[in-house]
């Protein structure tokens, strides 16, 4: 899967998560606060407020995640990063939605506010984290197996650079580097010739990065 395909997968997962959490909240409020029964939940889909929220809220979450940089480097994401970013964006986003959409609702007691806030918070965090972890875990496995990688350039070609590359190649889990070649740091270090192409000297750095679409640079 290319970078755009991976971003699209995250966008779809985030939309589904936002729609699911909004649906959960709407059904919960209908049943618990409006004297409906659980068997009446399909009637929620006929409510214009539900449809309006379904159109707006997923877009709001896309914006939150975009501002947090959660679509920028899809191949560099990992599970700890997902947990951290999903947690703080959920806390902030739910508070915004609470004050924008729920605070003016007619209620019997403030417990209803707390209940609605809890349902939205837990629901959105759970759905979003689950969807993202599925994608991220699959991506990490693909990278560690060597199936997916990102173009990498090495700056330096001396014995220290050779040792660095040998250490990287000896890792049990593939780090995702696809070495396209190396740039000579001082114009004379060519020890890396045995591992990868010599792409020239430092004055060609910018041209090499562009022509080989380099995403990672290792200074060795």
What are these regions (language model features)?
Residues 44, 135-220:
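A solvent-exposed beta-alpha-beta segment
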Residues 1-148, 215:
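Signature of alpha-helical transmembrane segments in polytopic membrane proteins
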């Amino acid at each position: 899967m290319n970078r755009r395909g991976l971003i699209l997968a995250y966008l779809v997962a985030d939309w589904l998560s936002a729609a699911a959490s909004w649906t959960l909240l709407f059904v919960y409020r209908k049943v618990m606060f409006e004297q409906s029964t659980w068997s009446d939940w399909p009637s929620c889909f006929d409510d214009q407020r539900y449809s309006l929220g379904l159109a707006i809220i997923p877009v709001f979450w896309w914006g939150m995640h975009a501002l947090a940089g959660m679509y920028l480097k899809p191949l560099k994401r990992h599970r700890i990063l997902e947990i951290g970013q999903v947690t703080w964006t959920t806390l902030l986003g739910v508070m915004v939605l609470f004050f924008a959409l729920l605070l003016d609702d007619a209620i019997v007691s403030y417990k209803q506010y707390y209940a609605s806030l809890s349902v939205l918070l837990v629901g959105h965090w759970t759905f979003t984290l689950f969807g993202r972890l599925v994608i991220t875990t699959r991506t990490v496995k693909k990278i560690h197996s060597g199936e997916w990688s990102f173009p990498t350039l090495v700056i330096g070609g001396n014995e220290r650079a050779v040792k660095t590359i040998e250490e990287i190649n000896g890792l049990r889990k593939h780090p995702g580097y696809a070495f396209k070649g190396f740039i000579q740091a001082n114009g004379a270090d060519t020890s890396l010739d045995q591992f990868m192409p010599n792409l020239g000297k430092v004055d060609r750095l910018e041209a090499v990065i562009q022509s080989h679409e380099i995403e990672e640079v290792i200074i060795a």
